[in-house]
Amino acid sequence: MATIIEINKKKALEVKNFEFTYAKADVPSVKKLSMPVAKHNITALIGPSGCGKTTLLRSFNRMHDLYPNNKYSGEITFKDRNILTSKEDLIKLRIQIGMIFQKPTAFPMSIFDNVAYGLKLQGIKNRTELSGRVEKALKDAAIWNEVKDRLKHDANGLSGGQQQRLCIARAVAVEPEVLLFDEPTSALDPISTGGIEELIVELRERVSIIIVTHNMQQAARVSDYTGFMYLGELIELGKTEEIFVTPKEKLTEEYITGKFG
């Protein structure tokens, strides 16, 4: 039985009895999992490799639907609807719930066009409006001052840390309500990692954030709530300080203290 804190706040998402099985797999990667996600807070998911945390993260905006024959059941509630139904508009969903991947994924186009890409998909064609929204997004991602004089340059000429902030700018440009971060700093140097962590904390005021990380120190630094997963199950979810200082589950304590990993 999982230990899950009662969150007396508005919820960005709520998961109920969610189970996910990859195509051709015999055992679910996520098993009957339930959890709330607090609105305008940062929730970290930690646990050893293969525990199901990235599988769960990618379920929040149905990224698994890009591949056939995966199976899922249960509910993931967002804006008072179960997003797992066949009626869900996945393009709209992925605008409302954006994702930042482990490896920076700058598109092979200019810096400006990278950020404008999603805006154009939304039907925004007016150049003045596009320019304003692109500038705002780049400022929100703390990269405007570094790129404002080279917006027409190829985005792949940016450093790794800059490309990751560009990806964040591209995601926030379409004004999502939730952002999903999948190991967003694992490919970056310590200085770039610090910058991304500061940015994630700043973004919390505008969006709800869920971050998967193998770095427990990172989870402790940036998150408000932390969930520990093991073998596809949520073992414990609580306030981050309590999870790291006074965990209620023995398995959580053993993982936090490095007895396994």
Curated annotation (Swiss-Prot):
Alphabetized CDD domains for the sequence: ABC_PstB_phosphate_transporter
Molecular function terms, GO-annotated: ATP binding; ATP hydrolysis activity; ATPase-coupled phosphate ion transmembrane transporter activity
GO cellular component terms listed in the entry, alphabetical order: plasma membrane
Top class in the EC scheme: translocase
Broad class of the protein's primary localization: membrane
Keyword vocabulary terms for this entry: ATP-binding, Cell inner membrane, Cell membrane, Membrane, Nucleotide-binding, Phosphate transport, Translocase, Transport
Catalytic activity: phosphate(out) + ATP + H2O = ADP + 2 phosphate(in) + H(+)
Swiss-Prot/TrEMBL GO biological process terms: phosphate ion transmembrane transport
Domain of life, source organism: Bacteria
UniProt cross-references to PROSITE patterns, sorted A to Z: ABC_TRANSPORTER_1, ABC_TRANSPORTER_2, PSTB
Gene3D superfamilies hit by this protein: P-loop containing nucleotide triphosphate hydrolases
Chain ranges of the ABC transporter domain: 13-256
tRNA processing among keywords: no
EC nos: 7.3.2.1
Membrane topology of the entry: Peripheral membrane protein
Residues where ATP binds: G47, P48, S49, G50, C51, G52, K53, T54
Location of the protein in the cell: Cell inner membrane
Function text: Part of the ABC transporter complex PstSACB involved in phosphate import. Responsible for energy coupling to the transport system.
Quaternary structure and interacting proteins, as annotated: The complex is composed of two ATP-binding proteins (PstB), two transmembrane proteins (PstC and PstA) and a solute-binding protein (PstS).
Matches recorded under PANTHER family: ABC TRANSPORTER I FAMILY MEMBER 17
Family, as annotated: Belongs to the ABC transporter superfamily. Phosphate importer (TC 3.A.1.7) family.
The protein, known as: Phosphate import ATP-binding protein PstB
